[in-house]
Every structure is written in structure tokens, then in C-alpha cells.
Design a protein with these regions (language model features):
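N-terminal secretory signal peptides that target proteins for export/translocation
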Residues: 1-6
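Bacterial N-terminal signal peptides
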Residues: 9-21
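C-terminal and late-domain segments of enzyme folds
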Residues: 27-59, 70, 74-79, 84-92, ...
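Portal/gating segments that form or line small-molecule/metal binding sites
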Residues: 72-115, 128
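Catalytic-core regions built around general acid/base machinery
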Residues: 112-115, 135-149
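Catalytic nucleophile loop
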Residues: 120-123, 142-166
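Glycine/threonine-rich flexible loop motifs
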Residues: 126-136
Length: 294
């Protein structure tokens, strides 16, 4: 463990000295302040919840849970989505839920966000989150939470909503990648996020999105796995893999995505991946070359 921490300190020292700063002046993709925890669904790894609570300020920090992606009309303090947080020791949990945009635009409804240090989006269908909260006072409150250094996390649909482009946002089925809802909350700009990546054999699905919108960065997160975003850098934690879909880069001849493992880092601004070793050289097989036409 000591060797790992020493290597981690070395990694960040070299990375920051090379100009990959985490400060707001360098931001183009990630949040200028605060953190994001983006989980690919099937959350069982205690480390992920613990990291979220740590970034919020500890188990006594006020946390708002938003279960609106789910299919139920009503949620309360006994909602199943709170169980993992209670088991992790969280003591101040508030449920925030509505399907009424007028209510989402009311000061009374938004009030819990003003005191929160963390917000968590549960799973379900991401278009429900967009319908209720996109471009409302709730959306403004979420941005304000990040600006004061808070953390926003989410799993499954709660992961996808954090990107600027909303994949699987069709109200008819979640198999349509570019549907009738295409705008997310944009905590990550110019990014499309997919989830349940390998568990549901979705590893090829983001290709059509990035081919249609070649400036977008596609990020696919498998179950029980997360990316933790600070500024324009993220780290992979959990038990499986994260896939990167970057139209300007390919893996070997024609490969349209590549995988990051737990412990790997990624610079969202430069679109370079790093493995925690005694250097910060990008992955050797990834070539800066546009995808071939099909």
C-alpha cells in the first residue's frame, strides 16, 4: 500500500508539472470545481460509495438522493436507493423527486440542494431526469453545488445524465442510442456516457454515436465500476473496465475503442490515457489517427 501511495504521489507530481493542471483555468470538459462519480450500474463495490461520501465531506455530510429516473411516481425516506448510503454510515439523507417541471423551478423544492454537499442520481431511464430537471432551478442548483466544491454521483441512468449528449434517451426503448431526448445535464461537456457496458454487451453501441458526432468523446462504464472526475482528469475505480471512444484516435489498425482498467487515469482535455507506473507516457498502441470510414 505504501508503494502504491508513493507511486500515486509521483504520478500526480509529474502530471501537474507537465501542465495538466486541475485548476479552473485549464478546464474545457470537466467541472471547474467539485467532483463527479459516474458509475456504470450494478453497484456493489463499497469503495465507490465510500469515495463519494469522502468527496462530500464524510458520512455526516448532507446528501440529496434523486431517484427520478425510476418508474415509481412517489419516493420517500424509505426508498431502496438509500440503503447503500445508510449501510456506509451516511446520516443526513434527503430524497428529492418530482415529475413536475414547475415544482422543479420552485425555490422551496430546490432548498435542500443549497445545503447539500453531495447529490446522487439513481438508475432507471435517463430521459425522465431530463424531462424533470433539465434547464430548471434544480439544474442551476446542481451546478452551484459543484461550484462550491461538492460532488455529484450517479449510477446507470444517473451516470448517463451527467454527459452533455444523452444516449439511450428515447422514451420508447433504451436500445435506441440517438432518440427523442439527446441533451443531458452537461457536467461533462462534449461527452456521451453509456453504462452496463460489458455486462450487457454494449461495447459497440457508442460507435454509431461518435461516428455521427465525431467531436463527441464517448465513455462507456461497465457495472460495479466508476470514473471519479476532478477537473479534466478522471480515475477508474471498481471492479471492471471503462471504454473510450475518440474519433481522433484508434487502437491499432481500425480499433474504435480501447479499455481502461481500475487505477488508470484519463485526461479529458488532451484525450490521453495514463497507467500508474513510473512514467506518464500514453498507452503505446493508441494512435492519433481518425477512424477509417466504413
Amino acid at each position: 500500500m505504501r508503494g502504491y501511495r508513493t507511486g500515486l504521489r509521483f504520478f500526480w507530481t509529474v502530471l501537474l508539472s507537465a501542465g495538466f493542471t486541475v485548476g479552473a483555468h485549464a478546464q474545457e470538459v470537466g467541472p471547474a470545481s467539485g467532483s463527479l462519480v459516474i458509475v456504470g450500474g450494478g453497484l456493489r463495490d463499497e469503495e465507490i460509495i465510500e469515495r463519494f461520501l469522502q468527496l462530500a465531506g464524510g458520512p455526516d455530510a448532507p446528501i440529496v438522493v434523486i431517484p427520478t429516473a425510476g418508474s415509481s411516481e412517489r419516493y420517500d425516506q424509505y426508498s431502496p436507493g438509500l440503503r447503500q448510503f445508510r449501510e456506509a454510515g451516511a446520516t443526513q439523507l434527503t430524497v428529492l423527486h418530482t415529475r413536475d417541471r414547475d415544482e422543479a423551478n420552485s425555490d422551496a423544492f430546490v432548498a435542500p440542494l443549497r445545503e447539500a454537499r453531495g447529490v446522487w442520481f439513481g438508475g432507471g431511464r435517463q430521459w425522465r431526469l431530463a424531462d424533470s430537471y433539465l434547464n430548471t432551478k434544480v439544474h442551476e442548483g446542481l451546478r452551484a453545488l459543484l461550484e462550491r466544491g461538492g460532488v455529484i454521483g450517479g449510477t446507470s441512468a444517473g451516470a448517463t445524465i451527467q454527459g452533455s449528449y444523452l444516449v439511450r434517451g428515447d422514451t420508447r426503448t433504451n436500445t435506441i442510442m440517438m432518440g427523442d431526448h439527446e441533451e443531458g445535464l452537461a457536467f461533462l461537456r462534449n461527452v456521451a456516457i453509456d453504462q452496463h457496458l460489458l455486462k450487457r454487451n454494449r461495447q459497440f453501441d457508442l460507435i454509431e454515436v461518435v461516428e455521427a458526432h465525431s467531436d463527441l468523446l464517448g465513455i462507456g462504464v461497465d457495472e460495479n465500476t466508476a470514473i471519479v472526475v476532478r477537473g479534466d482528469m478522471f480515475e477508474v475505480i471498481g471492479q471492471s473496465y471503462v471504454a473510450i471512444y475518440d474519433h481522433s484516435r484508434q487502437l491499432g489498425p481500425g480499433g474504435r475503442y480501447y479499455l481502461l482498467a481500475p487505477g488508470d487515469r484519463y485526461n479529458l482535455r488532451t484525450r490521453q490515457a495514463y497507467r500508474l507506473t513510473m512514467s506518464v507516457e500514453p498507452f503505446e498502441r493508441i494512435k492519433q489517427e481518425p477512424w477509417p470510414e466504413r
